Regions:
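Short histidine-centered catalytic/ligand-binding loop motif
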Residues: 30-37, 117, 128-132, 192-196
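Sequence-level motif detector for i,i+2 pairs with an aromatic at +2
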Residues: 63, 82, 110, 176-178
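Surface-exposed helix-capping loop/turn segments at secondary-structure junctions
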Residues: 48-59, 146-147, 213-223
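Long, solvent-exposed, polar/charged low-complexity segments
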Residues: 2-16, 23, 45, 152-223
Length: 223
């Protein structure tokens, strides 16, 4: 199944599950979930994965599609269902949240995609800063290229006590506890078209040099 775009029914379901987060409502609308949210998200994920695999065949990428069911052990007062769905294209391994990962997520009032790693170990970020200190020119070249595009922005929590970066260009990158390069948007016409897949694929290709840089740090830290 090729990705043809999301539909208004996609958003209707997502808003519905946000405000009716209970089993009876979900079961009554399960066909809507499968047809208008799960199927197009799977198709989008497969198209993005196949394009990245073709462009970078040596990368050990795999596709992971989330479940709409929350972990019953971690509801914390929330309903049993998520009001969003995501997929990621990442390297294998269990501890993937500490490695760079390409992702897409859709909710009732937004969609987002990009690349980041959200739970890196302190030792990894220390190794990252050491690598920047020793060879700042490597990341500077990547950051200069990143700053020429407008599709993604740098985000992520920062250290309360600022760390001294080797150059002003790297200050924002050097002080992050974790790094996310993201594109956020409210529902728009792009989301309802086939062009969304190409936007994501081209964006991920743009981010690939940064992915390679951070993944190399992760690989070195695991040795």
């Amino acid at each position: 199944m090729a990705f043809e775009g999301y539909t208004q029914e996609t958003l209707d379901f997502l808003w519905g599950i946000r405000f009716n987060n209970e089993r009876s409502w979900f079961l009554a609308h399960k066909q809507d979930y499968e047809a208008h949210l799960l199927a197009p998200t799977r198709a989008l994920g497969e198209q993005v994965y196949e394009a990245l695999h073709a462009a970078f065949p040596k990368e050990p990428f795999l596709l992971k599609l989330s479940r709409i069911y929350r972990d019953a052990r971690r509801l914390h007062g929330n309903g049993p269902y998520k009001d969003h769905l995501w997929f990621c294209v990442r390297a294998g391994g269990e501890d993937w949240t500490g490695r760079p990962t390409f992702y897409f997520e859709i909710g009732p009032d937004y969609y987002s995609y990009g690349m980041g790693f959200w739970a890196p170990k302190a030792a990894l970020m220390e190794a990252y800063r050491k690598a920047v200190d020793e060879h700042p020119e490597v990341l500077e070249k990547l950051v200069k290229r990143f700053n020429k595009q407008a599709q993604f922005t740098l985000s992520g929590p920062e250290y309360a006590r600022k760390k001294t970066a080797p150059s002003p260009l790297l200050a924002a990158w050097y002080n992050k506890k974790s790094i996310n390069l993201q594109h956020d948007a409210a529902p728009d016409e792009r989301m309802f078209s086939q062009e969304l897949a190409q936007d994501i694929i081209e964006g991920f290709r743009t981010l690939m040099p940064l992915y390679t840089y951070f993944d190399g740090l992760c690989a070195a830290e695991m040795v």
